[in-house]
């Protein structure tokens, strides 16, 4: 299958993920539980990552595991800005934009210092409220960052993570 066809299928699956992974509500305790779930997976699998769960106005959870770097926290910030701007998964935008340089097209006027075209940011969509924040992971290849977030969010909201997972690249 051609790369473009693979991307189209993955984009379709990510859209299904975004439509299925709706939180009934989200508070500080929910964010801690979700963040801890991601951290537990990372520790078990020996993944060096940074994790951020934030609403638009404040951070609710942050953690880093062994192997994460200072750069990962900067990637978290830049991915958060992308979710805030577009209200969709950052990996979906990576596939839609199809740019090797991880920068948005110049006409978007988004400074690379503040916006990263990289997977791992996922919108927090609350039933009846819309997108209110983002869950972000940084430290793995971008598709793996995305898959880790989707797995944890799916488990958290009672969806089947296997049915929602992207196929291996």
Curated annotation (Swiss-Prot):
Family matches, as InterPro entries: PduO/GlcC-like, PduO/GlcC-like_sf, YBR137W-like
Checking HAMAP family in the record gives:
UPF0303
The organism's place on the tree of life at top rank? Bacteria
- Provenance organism: Brucella canis (strain ATCC 23365 / NCTC 10854 / RM-666)
Q: Which NCBIfam families match?
A: PRK02487.1-2 (NF002693), PRK02487.1-5 (NF002696)
Q: Which family does it belong to?
A: Belongs to the UPF0303 family.
Query: Which named protein is this?
Result: UPF0303 protein BCAN_A1444
One Pfam short name: HbpS-like
């Amino acid at each position: 299958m051609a790369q473009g066809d693979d991307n189209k299928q993955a984009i379709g699956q990510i859209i299904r993920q975004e439509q299925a992974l709706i939180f009934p509500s989200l508070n500080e305790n929910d964010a801690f539980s979700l963040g801890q779930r991601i951290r537990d997976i990372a520790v078990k699998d020996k993944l060096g990552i940074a994790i951020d769960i934030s609403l638009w106005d404040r951070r609710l959870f942050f953690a880093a595991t062994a192997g994460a770097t200072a750069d990962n926290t900067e990637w978290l910030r830049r991915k958060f800005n992308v979710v805030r701007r577009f209200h969709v998964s950052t990996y979906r935008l990576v596939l839609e934009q199809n740019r090797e340089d991880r920068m948005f097209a110049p006409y978007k006027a988004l400074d690379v210092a503040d916006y990263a075209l990289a997977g791992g940011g996922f919108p927090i969509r609350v039933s009846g409220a819309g997108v209110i924040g983002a869950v972000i992971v940084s430290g793995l290849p971008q598709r793996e960052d995305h898959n880790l977030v989707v797995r944890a969010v799916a488990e958290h909201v009672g969806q089947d993570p296997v049915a929602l997972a992207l196929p291996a690249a």
